Regions:
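Short alpha-helix capping/helix-loop boundary micro-motifs
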Residues: 2, 25-28
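Short, structured beta-strand/loop micro-motifs enriched in basic residues and often containing a Trp
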Residues: 12-26
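C-terminal structural segments of small proteins and small subunits
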Residues: 48-76
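Ubiquitin-like/PB1-type beta-grasp interaction modules and other compact soluble beta-rich domains
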Residues: 2-7, 51
Length: 76
C-alpha cells in the first residue's frame, strides 16, 4: 500500500514509488537523490508538519509539506 510522504511521522523508513511532479521541481528532487526505489528515513517533523527533515543517501534534507506530498512512498 502506498501513501504520500507528508503523512509520516519521525522514525518511519519508506521507499519512493513515484514522484508526482515535473519541470524544475522534478529536477530539484532528482538532483537531491529523490529517485524511485530510494529509501528515506523521516528524521524529524516540525510543528504543523512543515518542514520535514529527511535522511536520504546519508544526507539530511528538509522539504516543505507541499513538496513531500508530491512523493508517493511505501513503508518498508
Amino acid at each position: 500500500m502506498t501513501s504520500r510522504l507528508d503523512t509520516f511521522q519521525a522514525g518511519k523508513n519508506v521507499k519512493i514509488v513515484k514522484i508526482h511532479t515535473e519541470g524544475k521541481l522534478m529536477h530539484k528532487l532528482l538532483d537531491m537523490g529523490f529517485v524511485p526505489s530510494s529509501v528515506i528515513e523521516v528524521v524529524r517533523v516540525a510543528p504543523l508538519n512543515d518542514p520535514m527533515e529527511l535522511k536520504i543517501h546519508n544526507y539530511h534534507i528538509s522539504l516543505r509539506k507541499s513538496e513531500a506530498h508530491l512523493i508517493e512512498v511505501e513503508v518498508i
